[in-house]
């Protein structure tokens, strides 16, 4: 539970209350009443809370010492810039970023999201039964949210069950945009680490430089297979093992299936693997609907140029009971996520401050009145 505590050194800041959760100090705006901690990760701690002004339940994520690690700081800044623009019922909503007291020296960031009950990883590993309707509805919502992102030229690049939040109504929302980039970006971001290995597309495993939205579709296919089978389809131990597991299921590739590989060494490796006929997905998931298997096969195609797109997946017969094209408008404008990777920590801090101002017009008004 959240325990109210005295401020550090007995010196509290106006407009802030202090709470201890899991031996971590939270300095949060007085309008929020924390309930209990609900999650912990490398980034920090998440607690559930109530907004006194609206009576709405929210999730507060504290990112501790965000500037200690430059990569984490840039990830956080990108997520703030992106979520300010995104408005879709299958994408998590960032409702507030708490203003720190000291503009030039703050170390922690407090993000306020809509509150969800669990995530798809927890559901998959639970004993709770999942019907065809459950699997279909989760996949539909994931594809809807992803179609919206792709319409804004955004690649998520880290889709996995743990990044898909779910509530008691089975509503699903995509979260964690720290690795997201614009599809138009070129250069160094294309070769850096992306996507948790088990959900990583072949073109990433093979170090192809020019990838696009199809990497997210592969991840969706892996997630859908995990929903159907209640375990990861390709639980590789390292990169080469990951490729072997994929080929063992899909079967040995034809010459035309390898044309997209622009790395000669990578192409030689795939060709060196022993011949395998593959394993029919219908035999791996014998209880799945035949149309579900057909769609899964189209998402898990080795060659990204032949893989189904998000829009095509939504138009697949398996989705026809749920999909209404007129109810899925695209994002309004493409979003610019390009940030100079070499900017100083002070500049990242200043850019975060300006992102916070979008949620606090009262601070902007006070600054203008000076």
Swiss-Prot record:
This is Mitogen-activated protein kinase 3. ATP binds at residues 38-46, 61. It catalyses: L-seryl-[protein] + ATP = O-phospho-L-seryl-[protein] + ADP + H(+); L-threonyl-[protein] + ATP = O-phospho-L-threonyl-[protein] + ADP + H(+). Coiled coil: none annotated. Keywords: ATP-binding, Kinase, Nucleotide-binding, Phosphoprotein, Serine/threonine-protein kinase, Transferase. Its EC number is 2.7.11.24. A motif (TXY) lies at residues 191-193. InterPro entries: Kinase-like_dom_sf, MAP_kinase, MAP_kinase_CS, Prot_kinase_dom, Protein_kinase_ATP_BS, Ser/Thr_kinase_AS. One of its GO terms (cellular component) is cytoplasm. Dually phosphorylated on Thr-191 and Tyr-193, which activates the enzyme. The TXY motif contains the threonine and tyrosine residues whose phosphorylation activates the MAP kinases. Activated by threonine and tyrosine phosphorylation. One of its GO terms (molecular function) is protein serine kinase activity. Residues 32-319 form the Protein kinase domain. One of its GO terms (biological process) is intracellular signal transduction. It is an enzyme of class 2 (transferase). It comes from Oryza sativa subsp. japonica (Rice). The active site is at 158 (proton acceptor). SMART domains: S_TKc. The modification Phosphotyrosine is found at residue 193. Gene3D superfamilies: Phosphorylase Kinase, domain 1 (3.30.200.20), Transferase(Phosphotransferase) domain 1 (1.10.510.10). The modification Phosphothreonine is found at residue 191. It holds the Pfam family Pkinase. Belongs to the protein kinase superfamily. CMGC Ser/Thr protein kinase family. MAP kinase subfamily.
């Amino acid at each position: 539970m959240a325990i109210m505590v005295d401020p550090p050194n007995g010196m509290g800041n106006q407009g802030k209350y202090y709470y201890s959760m899991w031996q971590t100090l939270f300095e949060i705006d007085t309008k929020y009443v924390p309930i209990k901690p609900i999650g912990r990760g490398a980034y920090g701690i998440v607690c559930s809370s109530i907004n006194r002004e609206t009576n709405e339940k929210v999730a507060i994520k504290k990112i501790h010492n965000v500037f200690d690690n430059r990569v984490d700081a840039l990830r956080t800044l990108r997520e703030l810039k992106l979520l300010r623009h995104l408005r879709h019922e299958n994408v998590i909503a960032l409702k507030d970023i708490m203003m720190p007291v000291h503009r030039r020296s703050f170390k922690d960031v407090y993000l306020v999201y809509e509150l969800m009950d669990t995530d798809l990883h927890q559901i998959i590993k639970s004993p709770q039964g999942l019907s065809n309707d459950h699997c279909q509805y989760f996949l539909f919502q994931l594809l809807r949210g992803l179609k919206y992102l792709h319409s804004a030229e955004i690649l998520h690049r880290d889709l996995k069950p743990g990044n898909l939040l779910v509530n008691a109504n089975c509503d699903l929302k995509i979260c964690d945009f720290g690795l997201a980039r614009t599809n138009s970006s070129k250069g160094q971001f294309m070769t850096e680490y992306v996507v948790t290995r088990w959900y990583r597309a072949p073109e990433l495993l093979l170090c192809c430089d020019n990838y696009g939205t199809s990497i997210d579709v592969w991840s969706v296919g892996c997630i859908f297979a995990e929903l159907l089978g209640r375990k990861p389809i390709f639980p590789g131990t390292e990169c080469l093992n990951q490729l072997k597991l994929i080929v063992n299921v899909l079967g040995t590739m034809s010459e035309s299936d390898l044309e997209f590989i622009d790395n000669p060494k990578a192409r030689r490796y795939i060709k060196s693997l022993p011949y395998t006929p593959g394993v029919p997905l219908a035999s791996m998931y014998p209880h799945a609907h035949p149309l579900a298997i057909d769609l899964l096969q189209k998402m898990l195609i080795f060659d990204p140029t032949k893989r189904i797109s998000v829009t095509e997946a939504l138009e697949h017969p398996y989705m026809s009971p749920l999909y209404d094209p007129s109810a899925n408008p695209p994002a309004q404008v493409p979003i610019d996520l390009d940030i100079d990777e070499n900017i100083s920590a002070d500049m990242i801090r200043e850019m975060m401050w300006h992102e916070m101002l979008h949620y606090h017009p009262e601070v902007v008004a006070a600054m203008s009145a000076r």
